[in-house]
Structures are given as structure tokens and as C-alpha cells.
């Protein structure tokens, strides 16, 4: 009987520990970024074309954080905390980010001991090719290389 209790307790422990892990994993996945599909996109005060335009974005692939959904509209927030609604036809799944650290170094390989390729200014838009634990391979303008993941704001996962 004691052996069955130990097995039962182990199964319960396993269930709760894995559910905790998956809850954390799902919470991470809920941070959802999209990017702007066009070089001119309206940010509206509400989820319809009748609502006034708050802001006009003029940067294709600018990363946008999705806060909420309403049919064909997404409530969004940008890196400057401007929030409003964008129609889904104006959003893309293209992985992009903004560099948030001034003079961050772009490296040839994902290590600080690699050859530096360029320095990126704050606000520089980058397209994400792939990410590892602490690094992302990006392209920006004519440059392609690796940058530290924690310097980026956008869809890095």
C-alpha cells in the first residue's frame, strides 16, 4: 500500500510541476508582436473605420505589440506607448524589432569575441532572421549579423 501511495504522490507532483511549466510557457507565448504591412498605417481611437485616426505610422515592418482583439481589429501599443486600433489587413507576421540600446554592436557571430560589423543607433529597425538563447541574427539596411537579444523590442521569439 505504501508503494502505491508513493507512486500516486509522484504522479500528482509530476502533474503540478509540468502544469506550472506549461503555464509559464503559455504566458510567454501570449506576448504577441506583429509588424506593419505597409509604409503608411493608421492607428485609430477605436475598432472601426468610423473612429478618428490618432496617429499615422510611416514605417513598414515597425513592430507592434498586440494587446487585444475585436473581430478584424487589433488593439496595439508601440515602443513609445502609443496605443490604439489597427485593422488586421495592415498587419504582418514578419518578424521585426527595434534596437533599444545606443551604439549596440552587430557581430559576425553570436559572441562578443566575434568580429564587429556595425554599430546600430537607438530606434534602428531590424528584421529578425532567427534567434538563439541570448542572440538574434538580424538584417538592417546593408548589414547582416548577430545582436544581443535584450537590446531588441519586438518579435524576437
Please tell me what each predicted stretch does.
Residues 48-51:
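Second-shell loop/turn segments in exported
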Residues 1-11:
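Bacterial N-terminal signal peptides that target proteins for export
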Residues 15-24:
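C-terminal segment of classical bacterial N-terminal signal peptides
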Residues 13-15, 44:
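Compositionally biased, low-complexity segments
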